[in-house]
Swiss-Prot record:
Lineage, highest ranks first: Eukaryota, Fungi, Dikarya, Ascomycota, Saccharomycotina
Functional description taken from the UniProt entry: Component of the DASH complex that connects microtubules with kinetochores and couples microtubule depolymerisation to chromosome movement; it is involved in retrieving kinetochores to the spindle poles before their re-orientation on the spindle in early mitosis and allows microtubule depolymerization to pull chromosomes apart and resist detachment during anaphase.
Keyword Lipoprotein: no
Originating organism: Kluyveromyces lactis (strain ATCC 8585 / CBS 2359 / DSM 70799 / NBRC 1267 / NRRL Y-1140 / WM37)
Coiled-coil region(s): 203-275
Protein name (database record): DASH complex subunit SPC34
Primary localization class, coarse: nucleus
Subcellular location: Nucleus; Cytoplasm, Cytoskeleton, Spindle; Chromosome, Centromere, Kinetochore
Keywords tagged on the record: Cell cycle, Cell division, Centromere, Chromosome, Chromosome partition, Coiled coil, Cytoplasm, Cytoskeleton, Kinetochore, Microtubule, Mitosis, Nucleus
Gene Ontology annotations for the cellular component aspect, listed alphabetically: cytoplasm; DASH complex; spindle microtubule
Length: 275
């Protein structure tokens, strides 16, 4: 056991001597580790190996204040310096019977979410159509009217929240939540809300815009239906194209069987004549 320890110490000494020939950048704002036990011969080498620095260069970087604390001459400070200063401040305040600094205050998550929604609303561009144009829709109580009208329809309520806030978080009662935007909702929900707007605020301008949107929607829906019919026709054609192969094989089998039966009859006739 002692032999292996001596071997390890010898290897460390050789490594330390080898590393000592290299130049290392002076230490930063952290404090390097120091191994006690200077009475032993190898302790200086271990300290030098761990510190990775020249003591002369280190002394040129640091200076001591009146309290004996080490500080960098270039004025840079780190976490260690902050903790030392904080500890000294706490001791001084307690000696003077002053209250301790306030602890870290926990802010509820809902506050952050509401702040985020507020920032999103401020950054949004007023590019919405119908009665949602401008920033006075909340003042007019439009969303309150629509939310009351669709109070039993959860999807439309989520759509209205997304329309007002830019997005809505769903599934808050489960572990996995999902953020939905206005474009994530079905077209049928959007049209239902727009129809209700036309009924509640029957203005000519809104009706004209709604009719234009309905024309575009109906045109796109007709194109989609036509493409779906073409796809169905192509699928049927493909199925019918595959059927003739099966029918042709079965017809060939029937033809061969009939040919075999015909030959068997001819063979029977020949055998009868030979008898």
């Amino acid at each position: 056991m002692s032999g292996s320890l001596d071997y390890c110490l010898d290897q460390i000494s050789k490594s330390a001597e080898s590393i000592s020939t290299l130049y290392f950048k002076p230490p930063g704002i952290f404090r390097n580790a120091i191994v006690p036990g200077n009475s032993k011969v190898y302790s200086d080498l271990i300290v030098k190996l761990i510190r990775d620095g020249d003591s002369i260069e280190e002394m040129s970087l640091y200076s001591t204040d009146n309290d004996g604390n080490m500080k960098r001459k270039d004025g840079k400070v780190g976490i260690y310096d902050h903790l030392l200063e904080r500890e000294a401040t706490l001791k001084r305040n307690r000696a003077l019977c002053l209250p301790d600094p306030r602890p870290i205050t926990y802010i509820p998550k809902g506050f952050y979410l509401s702040q985020n929604d507020h920032v999103i609303r401020k950054k949004q561009k007023p590019a919405r159509d119908f009665i949602f144009e401008g920033s006075n829709s909340d003042e007019l109580g439009i969303y309150d009217v629509l939310l009351k009208k669709f109070s039993k329809d959860e999807q439309i309520k989520q759509f209205l929240h997304a329309l007002r806030n830019g997005s809505v978080i769903t599934g808050e009662d489960v572990s996995r939540r999902k953020t939905l935007f206005v474009e994530d909702f079905p077209i049928s929900i959007i049209l239902s809300v727009f129809r209700e707007i036309i009924d509640q605020w029957p203005l000519t301008e809104y009706k004209e815009k709604f009719e234009k949107l309905m024309q575009i929607y109906n045109g796109l829906q007709a194109d989609i239906n036509e493409l779906q019919k073409k796809v169905e026709i192509q699928e049927l054609d493909f199925q019918h194209e595959a059927l003739p192969e099966k029918t042709s094989i079965s017809s060939l089998i029937d033809k061969e069987e009939k040919e075999i039966q015909k030959l068997e009859k001819q063979l029977d006739l020949l055998e009868g004549r030979n008898k």
